[in-house]
Swiss-Prot record:
The keyword GTP-binding applies. To M.thermoautotrophicum MTH765. NCBIfam families: small_GTP (TIGR00231). GO terms for molecular function: GTP binding; GTPase activity. The keyword GTP-binding applies. InterPro entries: Gliding_Motility_GTPase (IPR052705), P-loop_NTPase (IPR027417), Small_GTP-bd (IPR005225), Small_GTPase_MJ1339 (IPR016433), T_Tr_GTP-bd_dom (IPR000795). Residues 17-112 form the G domain. This is Uncharacterized protein MJ1339. GTP binds at residues 12-19. Transmembrane segments: none annotated. Keywords: GTP-binding, Nucleotide-binding. It comes from Methanocaldococcus jannaschii (strain ATCC 43067 / DSM 2661 / JAL-1 / JCM 10045 / NBRC 100440) (Methanococcus jannaschii).
Length: 154
Protein backbone atom coordinates (compact mmCIF):
# COMPACT_ATOMS: atom_id res chain seq x y z
CA UNK A 1 0.00 0.00 0.00
CA UNK A 2 1.23 3.50 -0.78
CA UNK A 3 2.45 5.88 1.91
CA UNK A 4 -0.72 8.00 1.78
CA UNK A 5 -3.02 4.95 1.92
CA UNK A 6 -4.11 3.01 4.98
CA UNK A 7 -5.89 -0.27 5.55
CA UNK A 8 -8.58 -0.31 8.23
CA UNK A 9 -10.24 -3.61 9.12
CA UNK A 10 -13.78 -3.36 10.51
CA UNK A 11 -14.21 -6.32 12.84
CA UNK A 12 -16.81 -7.53 15.30
CA UNK A 13 -19.14 -10.35 16.16
CA UNK A 14 -22.21 -11.25 14.11
CA UNK A 15 -25.02 -8.70 13.65
CA UNK A 16 -23.29 -5.76 15.35
CA UNK A 17 -23.74 -3.54 12.26
CA UNK A 18 -20.34 -3.69 10.56
CA UNK A 19 -21.69 -3.59 7.00
CA UNK A 20 -24.21 -0.84 7.79
CA UNK A 21 -21.46 1.17 9.45
CA UNK A 22 -19.16 0.82 6.45
CA UNK A 23 -21.89 1.70 3.96
CA UNK A 24 -22.91 4.80 5.91
CA UNK A 25 -19.35 5.94 6.60
CA UNK A 26 -18.50 5.71 2.95
CA UNK A 27 -21.82 7.11 1.71
CA UNK A 28 -21.37 10.00 4.11
CA UNK A 29 -17.88 10.88 2.86
CA UNK A 30 -17.42 9.48 -0.60
CA UNK A 31 -18.39 6.83 -3.08
CA UNK A 32 -18.33 3.09 -2.45
CA UNK A 33 -16.12 1.52 -5.08
CA UNK A 34 -17.23 -2.02 -4.32
CA UNK A 35 -19.50 -3.72 -1.85
CA UNK A 36 -19.10 -7.39 -1.00
CA UNK A 37 -21.43 -9.63 0.91
CA UNK A 38 -21.28 -10.41 4.59
CA UNK A 39 -20.08 -13.98 4.04
CA UNK A 40 -17.05 -12.61 2.23
CA UNK A 41 -15.08 -9.43 2.82
CA UNK A 42 -16.90 -6.11 2.50
CA UNK A 43 -14.77 -3.41 0.91
CA UNK A 44 -15.07 0.30 0.43
CA UNK A 45 -12.67 3.21 0.25
CA UNK A 46 -12.75 6.93 0.68
CA UNK A 47 -10.27 9.75 0.35
CA UNK A 48 -10.01 12.55 2.88
CA UNK A 49 -7.32 15.24 2.84
CA UNK A 50 -5.16 13.30 0.38
CA UNK A 51 -5.31 10.14 2.51
CA UNK A 52 -7.04 7.11 1.01
CA UNK A 53 -8.58 4.79 3.58
CA UNK A 54 -9.35 1.24 2.48
CA UNK A 55 -12.03 -0.32 4.70
CA UNK A 56 -12.27 -4.11 4.84
CA UNK A 57 -15.23 -5.55 6.74
CA UNK A 58 -14.98 -9.07 8.09
CA UNK A 59 -17.88 -11.49 8.53
CA UNK A 60 -18.94 -11.91 12.14
CA UNK A 61 -20.00 -15.55 12.13
CA UNK A 62 -17.67 -17.94 13.99
CA UNK A 63 -17.31 -20.21 10.95
CA UNK A 64 -15.60 -17.33 9.08
CA UNK A 65 -12.95 -16.59 11.74
CA UNK A 66 -10.22 -17.58 9.28
CA UNK A 67 -11.24 -14.60 7.13
CA UNK A 68 -10.50 -12.27 10.04
CA UNK A 69 -6.93 -13.57 10.07
CA UNK A 70 -6.62 -12.99 6.32
CA UNK A 71 -8.10 -9.50 6.49
CA UNK A 72 -5.79 -8.49 9.34
CA UNK A 73 -2.62 -9.19 7.33
CA UNK A 74 -0.92 -5.88 6.60
CA UNK A 75 -3.55 -3.79 8.35
CA UNK A 76 -2.67 -0.38 9.75
CA UNK A 77 -5.63 -0.10 12.11
CA UNK A 78 -8.70 -2.04 13.22
CA UNK A 79 -12.13 -0.78 14.16
CA UNK A 80 -13.97 -3.06 16.59
CA UNK A 81 -17.75 -2.70 16.42
CA UNK A 82 -19.70 -3.55 19.58
CA UNK A 83 -23.48 -3.84 19.92
CA UNK A 84 -24.69 -1.60 22.76
CA UNK A 85 -27.84 -3.71 23.17
CA UNK A 86 -25.78 -6.87 23.90
CA UNK A 87 -23.04 -5.41 26.05
CA UNK A 88 -19.52 -6.77 25.80
CA UNK A 89 -19.69 -10.42 24.78
CA UNK A 90 -17.15 -13.23 25.10
CA UNK A 91 -16.65 -13.04 21.34
CA UNK A 92 -15.97 -9.29 21.55
CA UNK A 93 -13.31 -9.99 24.17
CA UNK A 94 -11.75 -12.70 21.95
CA UNK A 95 -11.57 -10.29 18.99
CA UNK A 96 -9.89 -7.62 21.11
CA UNK A 97 -7.41 -10.16 22.52
CA UNK A 98 -6.60 -11.23 18.94
CA UNK A 99 -5.83 -7.63 17.94
CA UNK A 100 -3.74 -7.03 21.04
CA UNK A 101 -1.78 -10.26 20.50
CA UNK A 102 -0.97 -9.08 16.96
CA UNK A 103 -0.13 -5.59 18.26
CA UNK A 104 -2.63 -4.02 15.85
CA UNK A 105 -3.80 -0.59 17.04
CA UNK A 106 -7.57 -0.35 17.24
CA UNK A 107 -10.48 1.87 18.11
CA UNK A 108 -13.95 0.88 19.24
CA UNK A 109 -17.31 1.97 17.85
CA UNK A 110 -20.18 1.20 20.22
CA UNK A 111 -23.09 0.82 17.81
CA UNK A 112 -26.86 0.70 18.34
CA UNK A 113 -26.87 3.29 21.12
CA UNK A 114 -30.50 3.95 20.21
CA UNK A 115 -31.41 0.63 21.88
CA UNK A 116 -28.72 0.15 24.54
CA UNK A 117 -25.56 1.45 26.15
CA UNK A 118 -22.15 0.20 27.21
CA UNK A 119 -20.25 2.14 29.85
CA UNK A 120 -16.91 3.16 28.33
CA UNK A 121 -15.16 2.61 31.67
CA UNK A 122 -16.23 -1.05 31.43
CA UNK A 123 -14.45 -1.27 28.07
CA UNK A 124 -11.32 0.48 29.33
CA UNK A 125 -11.21 -1.96 32.27
CA UNK A 126 -10.24 -4.85 30.00
CA UNK A 127 -8.57 -3.30 26.95
CA UNK A 128 -6.62 -0.33 25.66
CA UNK A 129 -8.22 1.09 22.50
CA UNK A 130 -6.92 4.28 20.90
CA UNK A 131 -10.46 5.68 21.17
CA UNK A 132 -14.09 4.80 21.85
CA UNK A 133 -16.92 6.43 19.92
CA UNK A 134 -20.60 5.80 20.59
CA UNK A 135 -23.27 6.08 17.93
CA UNK A 136 -25.86 4.47 15.73
CA UNK A 137 -24.77 3.42 12.24
CA UNK A 138 -28.35 3.22 10.92
CA UNK A 139 -29.06 6.82 11.98
CA UNK A 140 -25.51 7.94 11.08
CA UNK A 141 -25.02 9.20 14.64
CA UNK A 142 -21.39 9.51 15.71
CA UNK A 143 -19.96 8.93 12.24
CA UNK A 144 -18.31 12.35 11.86
CA UNK A 145 -16.53 11.87 15.18
CA UNK A 146 -15.57 8.32 14.17
CA UNK A 147 -14.01 9.44 10.87
CA UNK A 148 -12.08 12.19 12.68
CA UNK A 149 -10.74 9.66 15.21
CA UNK A 150 -9.76 7.19 12.47
CA UNK A 151 -7.99 9.97 10.57
CA UNK A 152 -6.02 11.04 13.64
CA UNK A 153 -4.90 7.48 14.45
CA UNK A 154 -3.91 6.26 10.98
Amino acid sequence: MKKDEVKVVVIGSSDVGKTTLMENLIDKIGKVEYKGITTAIDYGSLTIKDKKIHFFGTPGQKRFEFMRELALKGTNFALVVLDASKGITKEDEEIIKLLESKKIPYGIFINKTDVGDIDTSEVYNFCNPKFIVKGCAVKKDGLDELINKIMSHT
